[in-house]
Amino acid sequence: RLLYAPAVEPSDMPILAYLGVDVFDDLNVELRSATSWALDDGSWTKVDTKTKDLQSQNREELDRWLLKIRTSIMNGTLRELVEVTSLHNPRVSQILHHSTSLLIEKGARRNVMIRANNLSLENPSVVDYQQRLSDYVPPAKNMVLLVLPCSARKPYFKSSSHKRFYNTIKEVDNYLALHIVSVTSPLGLVPRELEFCYPAAHYDIAVTGDWSASEVQMLREQFSRLEPEKHYLKAIVHAGSSSKIITELLRERKVDTIDTEAEKPSSFAGLEILQEFTRTAIAEIPVLSSKDRAKGEAIGLAKFQYGESSPFLAESEISGHMPYKLRCGDLATISPRVGGLGLTLAGAAKYAANGGPSVTAEDFKLVGDLFAVGVKSYDGHWVIGDQV
């Protein structure tokens, strides 16, 4: 079925399309044209003289505006168009704010790139990620937290700067006891195990080095979800221009924190400083084996993805390591396409048996993907992008 909204203001069309409206009409354009208003990129401007062809001009402009909306839907940029229109339309801003919780329940397409700005702090996918960080646990107790800056390339570990960071710290004895967490806006904190997960691997933002008050508060809330004081013995902050803020937030939580004060973290001098501080910080930290580290990575990632239903993965035979070779027996394996642990058929069956969501298909031989028309019923709670 199609959802139709009559006489809608053009500036409201992007937000209504974002929320599921399918069909609009030109009644509003007809009424506005009769009273000497000209449409320009979704907004109205009063004209002094009544133009003979104003009605046809406005219809053409409406066609261009609707084409812009359709194109943004196809390109996955409708959210960004909505955010732009909300900057000068308080009604759109209000609707966008109140729709966040509804859209979190619905879920999000996992291949949509988020082009972030300050308004993205309320993007449903961003809020959902931030809330689920409460389910995540670091790989082991008594580790040293290493906070690094984000990178333009996603996932971060593929970037040249993060490769330099890793090559530097792996020369330190017991480097597996270091836990890398990257700091970024609008997500806040991204542990290394979650870099494949949506939307951590699917966003882009202009890096300025400045943090707004709302972003600082977001970081504070993310640290309260991560609870570093419970999991880490120490913290090293090597995040460039963000280091001062991160250090203050960690010390608020009574974490023994070292700020390397390196202005250019990935420079030769910055890497030397990083290696020196990490070597000193983990000198007396209990040795963490690669096997225990891998098991902890799998548990943390499984809890983030599957919440209360995750123990069935943690109880399997964990092998391999991040980022590409982690396996949970014959139940799941790390998958960049899925964005985390991808279930096998055996894993999916066990997931459903342990309270995971499932769908019942019509009686036919399945070849390829299962579409909505072939679904008979479903059980459990799931949103767009979840595995069932």
Question: Where do the model's predicted regions map?
Answer:
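Short beta-strand/loop segments at the ligand-binding rim of alpha/beta enzyme cores
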Residues: R1-P6
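Alpha/beta catalytic cores of nucleotide-metabolism and tRNA/nucleoside-modifying enzymes
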Residues: P10-D128, P138-A140, R164
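Non-catalytic interaction/regulatory modules that flank or connect domains
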Residues: N111-L178
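Structural motif
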Residues: L148-A152, I236-S242
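Polybasic, low-complexity RNA-engagement segments
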Residues: R153-P155, K163, E276-V388
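Short connector loops at secondary-structure junctions
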Residues: Y175-H202
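Extended, charge-rich low-complexity interaction segments
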Residues: A201-I236, R279-P311
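Peripheral docking tails and interdomain loops at the edges
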Residues: S242-K291
